[in-house]
Amino acid sequence: MKNRDIIVEAGSKVLRSTPRKLNLVADLVRNKKVSFANVQLRFCEKKAAGFIMKVLNSAIANAQNNYGLNVDNLYIKEILIGKSLTLRRVYPKAMGRANRMSKFYSNITIKLKEIV
């Protein structure tokens, strides 16, 4: 088994952002080289870009330290964004009524692979 068969993985759970917002940013860097993705995320002004960049840097560190892979040959094979828990809150309304407010959380998993 050569290094090119290795898939490096990193993830983060229970992030305070909705999956829809994270997917907008994740679509920018799917199937791109790691160096290009880092630049894209650094200059993206969305809060979700910071979350994805942290997980991407963790995956890069895993590739270097655990497998000894070269960063220049890595690309993002897969970015998985999933639903996590939902926090329910009560939102007071007029005339003694109340509505329910939901705060959504997400999970991220990034898989890197070496370019053949």
From Swiss-Prot:
Cross-referenced Pfam families: Ribosomal_L22 (PF00237)
> What are its GO cellular component terms?
cytosolic large ribosomal subunit
Cite the GO molecular-function annotations of the record: rRNA binding; structural constituent of ribosome
- Report what the protein is called: Large ribosomal subunit protein uL22
State the PANTHER family in the record. CHLOROPLAST 50S RIBOSOMAL PROTEIN L22-RELATED, LARGE RIBOSOMAL SUBUNIT PROTEIN UL22M
Q: Which gene encodes it?
A: rplV
Keyword terms: Ribonucleoprotein, Ribosomal protein, RNA-binding, rRNA-binding
- Establish whether keyword rRNA-binding is in the entry: yes
Secretion signal: which residues? none
Gene Ontology biological process terms from the UniProt entry: translation
- SUPFAM superfamilies per record: Ribosomal protein L22 (SSF54843)
Assembly and oligomerization: Part of the 50S ribosomal subunit.
Q: Record the organism.
A: Wolbachia pipientis subsp. Culex pipiens (strain wPip)
Under HAMAP family, the record lists: Ribosomal_uL22_B
UniProt cross-references to NCBIfam families, sorted A to Z: rplV_bact
Domain of life assignment: Bacteria
Protein family according to the UniProt entry: Belongs to the universal ribosomal protein uL22 family.
The family database entries (InterPro entries) matched by this protein are listed as: Ribosomal_uL22 (IPR001063), Ribosomal_uL22_bac/chlpt-type (IPR005727), Ribosomal_uL22_bac/org-type (IPR047867), Ribosomal_uL22_sf (IPR036394)
Function (record text): This protein binds specifically to 23S rRNA; its binding is stimulated by other ribosomal proteins, e.g. L4, L17, and L20. It is important during the early stages of 50S assembly. It makes multiple contacts with different domains of the 23S rRNA in the assembled 50S subunit and ribosome. The globular domain of the protein is located near the polypeptide exit tunnel on the outside of the subunit, while an extended beta-hairpin is found that lines the wall of the exit tunnel in the center of the 70S ribosome.
UniProt key word Lipid metabolism: no
